[in-house]
Curated annotation (Swiss-Prot):
It comes from the Bacteria. Keywords: Amino-acid biosynthesis, Aromatic amino acid biosynthesis, Decarboxylase, Lyase, Tryptophan biosynthesis. One of its GO terms (biological process) is L-tryptophan biosynthetic process. Its EC number is 4.1.1.48. This is Indole-3-glycerol phosphate synthase. GO terms for molecular function: indole-3-glycerol-phosphate synthase activity; phosphoribosylanthranilate isomerase activity. It catalyses: 1-(2-carboxyphenylamino)-1-deoxy-D-ribulose 5-phosphate + H(+) = (1S,2R)-1-C-(indol-3-yl)glycerol 3-phosphate + CO2 + H2O. The keyword Lyase applies. HAMAP family: IGPS_B. The gene is trpC.
Amino acid sequence: MSNILTKILARKVEEIAERLLHVSQAELVARCADLPTPRGFAAALQATIVHGDPAVIAEIKKASPSKGVLREDFRPAEIAISYELGGASCLSVLTDVHFFKGHDNYLSQARDACTLPVLRKDFTIDPYQVYEARVLGADCILLIVAALDDAQLVDLSGLALQLGMDVLVEVHDIDELERAIQISAPLIGINNRNLSTFNVSLETTLTMKGLVPRDRLLVSESGILTSADVQRLRAAGVNAFLVGEAFMRAAEPGESLREMFFIT
């Protein structure tokens, strides 16, 4: 496990303990009973692909540990609207406070501003966070294989699916992929960023693509910065993408999305 991931997870344990002092898990469970049905995250991606278009999960991210602040003028609702107009199929919203300058409210603001399904992009390690994601309005959660043991993967993915959410399971290498396909989550995200070196290579997706079962939807994540990157992955049969940094640095994120994915 990388040094930065170890630090993030240690902080996440502290954060969950702090949140439990204010809102109990039982209270979150009770709130989940009265919520509207989630928007279909995996279904939205599949529908776009069936139509013949690339399925884009557009990320709303203020900052990252490696790059610092990506966007000073950060307005989640406006960014969400821009992404929807630009052709995104789904959104991903960073809610981690300490390392990514995210906030739970960013997810709610983005989701309320558009009709797209939303992924809560955070470091989920405990059932408390799954219930919390559902209460916030998330339609999908992220599970990072490098951060979890097999029992956690089974339990957390099962709980999310039981609550009506989809699950994006993120892997970085073949060993993690073999673990990911043992659970029934519909989405497999291949992160092109090496967690140890933070180097990025699209070869990670291209090398591992053939090992993803046909009944799972592969999502390529990180390092997709240009239309040439998109064309390279599309030519190899990759149809779903998670992109954040390239859009966050653009004056108009949705227009940047449209230019990268839909103008040839």
